[in-house]
Each structure stands twice: as C-alpha cells, then as structure tokens.
Regions:
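Feature captures hydrophobic
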Residues: 1-240
Length: 240
C-alpha cells in the first residue's frame, strides 16, 4: 500500500528533482530554458511533507531543500494534495509571487515536466530511437537514486531497512555513463548526483542496456550478478 507522505517525498526528491538532469542533457529542455526572460526559483511546500525549491535559469535547474531564495511559492495542504500535482496536474495555493508562480507553472514548468514524463514513461516506439533510449534510461537512473533516499527517510517499511544500515557512502552507477552517491549518516539517507570518492560500498551496472532491463524487470538480477555484469564491492549489506 502506498503511503501518501512517502510518495510526496519520492515525487519531490525522485521525480521532480530529475528536472536538474533533464535540463542538463535534453535539447528540448535547454530550449525551454533559453526562452526564460529571467531566473525563477519555484518553491513547493507541503504541510506534513517535503519542502523544496527549483531554481531555473537559462543555464539549467538546481534543486535545493527548503524555501530559501525562492521568488515564488506554492503551498499544499497535505501530501495527497501535492501528489495530485504530479498525478493530475492539480496546483496548490500560491503564497508568494502569485503572478510569477501561475505563469511559470502553466508555461515553462509544464513543458519541462511533460518532457520529463515522456522520457520517464516512454512508449515502445520512443525507445526505438537509440538516443532517446539512452537518455530515458539515464534519467530513470537519477530518479531511482533520488527515490532511494526519499523512501529510506519517509516510508514506514523502508525505515526498518534504513535503521539497520551502517554509516558510509554508497556508489551506484552505470559504467562510464552516470553515477550517484547515497550517503548514510545516523540512518538518514542523502542522494548526491555525482560519483562517490572512497565509497564503503559499490554497485555498478555494465552498460545502459543492462540498466534498462533491471529497471523494467526484464532481466534477472541474480543471473546478471553471476555473469559479472553487475559489479558489487565493499559492504554488500549496504547495497542490499
């Protein structure tokens, strides 16, 4: 059963936070940002849930925790209301920079999230394009990396696993393609979208095609481990 609060954190730190990566690698997203007249820092604050700000400029997107530096803000009365923004495009209540938040949300932000949705939920036809396939898989990787920490910190079942995870740094990645770091400190997980230095545990997939198969459940994790296509090292319990 899905927990609304945990899903709100996944939507913030997993799904929407991938806008950072979308804006860094996707040509359509870059074109949308190129048309911005001025930088916009949009904050979503969820009662009983996450609060984060998305800083957009012509050069890209940066996600930060909290509301510091926001130029416009939208509040949500509950995690369920915030999840409705993701699932049903239902906005919250503008509380700062009302004109800016509404114009940006209905314009550039919607264009960016629509593009992200297309890449994270591709059709079979979309995936026939190799460049699209690779970008889709890479963005899915970053979404999963963010969601891991979101669930570990907020989902009641995942917290049991987090409670037994030792402190340290986990490196995860697709070989020679993309990497993320998951830091564990006092059972709190933090995802950083860069390759780890001196990790305590490592999990690396051999290539993009393998990663796609694992993400979609079309290949066997055990079989690929036995074949040596999934590299694991260090404190394996952290990877588990």
């Amino acid at each position: 059963m899905k927990e609304a609060k945990a899903m709100a954190y996944v939507n913030m730190y997993g799904v929407l936070a991938t806008l950072e990566n979308l804006c860094a690698v996707d040509d359509e997203a870059k074109q949308i940002l190129a048309e911005l007249k001025s930088p916009v820092s949009l904050c979503f604050e969820v009662a009983g849930g996450p609060c984060g700000t998305f800083h957009f400029s012509k050069s890209g997107c940066k996600f930060t925790e909290g509301s510091e530096g926001c130029t416009c803000k939208m509040n949500f009365k509950s995690p369920e209301k915030f999840n409705d923004l993701i699932d049903n495009s239902k906005p919250g209540i503008p509380t700062k920079g009302v004109v800016q938040v509404l114009s940006f949300l209905m314009g550039p932000f919607t264009k960016l999230t629509n593009r992200l949705t297309k890449l994270l939920m591709p059709t079979k036809e979309d995936l026939q394009n190799r460049a699209f396939f690779e970008e889709s898989t890479i963005l899915t990787f970053y979404t999963i990396a963010g969601a891991i920490s979101a669930l570990a910190n907020s989902d009641s079942i995942s917290k049991f696993t987090a409670a037994s995870t030792v402190d340290g740094v986990i490196s995860m990645g697709i070989k020679d393609t993309c990497y993320a770091t998951v830091k564990v400190k006092n059972h709190h997980f933090t995802t950083i979208k860069e390759k780890a230095n001196n990790p305590r545990a490592v999990m690396e997939f051999a290539d993009i095609d393998l990663a796609y198969g694992l993400f979609n459940g079309t290949v066997s994790t055990i079989a690929e481990l036995c074949e040596g296509n999934i590299y694991m090292a260090g404190m394996i319990s952290m990877v588990d």
